[in-house]
């Protein structure tokens, strides 16, 4: 990941979620928060499916880090990530398929 003219390596398994803010992304990991100038779509090219799931137009989550679902939000550590209405069913199906949640 490129950040302030530096290249930084981030372990994919440590990423909790990626949040888009216009042309910037925030990559929240277990140990740090990095900000990079890149559209979310470009970052998603490097994140393997089905581990990483887009759950909202502004959020991609690491499905292995989901602890709970509370209404229309996913709980990952102390963070609550919104689930878009139009992506709700696909999100649940993906989590079920990977045996990360049960009905």
Q: Can you describe what each PLM-predicted range is?
A:
Residues 1-76:
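Conserved binding/recognition cores within well-folded domains
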Residues 1-6, 79, 85-103:
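Eukaryotic intrinsically disordered, low-complexity regulatory linkers and tails enriched in Ser/Thr/Pro
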């Amino acid at each position: 990941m490129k950040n302030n003219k530096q290249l930084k390596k981030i372990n994919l398994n440590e990423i909790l979620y990626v949040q888009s803010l216009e042309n910037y992304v925030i990559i929240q990991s277990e140990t740090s928060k990095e900000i990079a100038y890149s559209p979310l779509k470009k970052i998603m090219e490097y994140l393997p499916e089905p581990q990483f799931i887009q759950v909202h137009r502004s959020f991609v989550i690491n499905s292995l880090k989901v602890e709970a679902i509370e209404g229309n939000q996913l709980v990952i550590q102390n963070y609550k990530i919104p689930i878009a209405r139009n992506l709700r069913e696909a999100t649940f199906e993906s989590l079920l398929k990977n045996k990360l949640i049960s009905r």
